[in-house]
UniProtKB/Swiss-Prot annotation:
One of its GO terms (biological process) is killing of cells of another organism. The keyword Ion transport does not apply. Salivary glands (at protein level). GO terms for cellular component: extracellular region. Belongs to the invertebrate defensin family. Type 2 subfamily. Its main location: secreted. Keywords: Antibiotic, Antimicrobial, Cleavage on pair of basic residues, Cytolysis, Defensin, Disulfide bond, Fungicide, Hemolysis, Immunity, Innate immunity, Secreted, Signal. This is Longicornsin. Has antibacterial activity against the Gram-positive bacteria S.aureus ATCC2592 (MIC=0.8 ug/ml), S.aureus 6A (MIC=0.8 ug/ml) and S.aureus 15A (MIC=1.6 ug/ml), and against the Gram-negative bacteria E.coli ATCC 25922 (MIC=3.2 ug/ml), E.coli 23A (MIC=6.4 ug/ml), E.coli 27A (MIC=6.4 ug/ml), P.aeruginosa 3A (MIC=3.2 ug/ml), P.aeruginosa 7A (MIC=0.8 ug/ml) and H.pylori NCTC11637 (MIC=6.4 ug/ml). Has antifungal activity against C.albidus ATCC2002 (MIC=25.6 ug/ml). Very low hemolytic activity against rabbit erythrocytes.
Length: 78
């Protein structure tokens, strides 16, 4: 019983460490879209291209896209 608990714990820790390292790598890859050089317009253009109608801003050295835009209700036909 103790061996299975230890194995389960080690798998859980390994999964957590892998997830944290993957997230850090992802954030590092997003680091530069103009925010590192102080050119926010590059970030804004990127966000507008990915999410039409959204805006972009820099937080730290990362480009963040604000997609909290209310959607229009669908038009009623008929």
């Amino acid at each position: 019983m103790a061996e299975s608990t230890t194995t389960c714990f080690l798998l859980l820790v390994t999964g957590y460490v892998t997830a944290v390292m993957s997230e850090e790598a992802h954030l590092r890859s997003r680091r530069d879209f103009g925010c590192g050089q102080g050119m926010i317009f590059m970030c804004q253009r990127r966000c507008m291209r990915l999410y039409p109608g959204s805006t972009g801003f820099c937080r730290g050295f990362r480009c963040m896209c604000d997609t909290h835009i209310p959607l229009r209700p669908p038009f009623m036909v008929g």
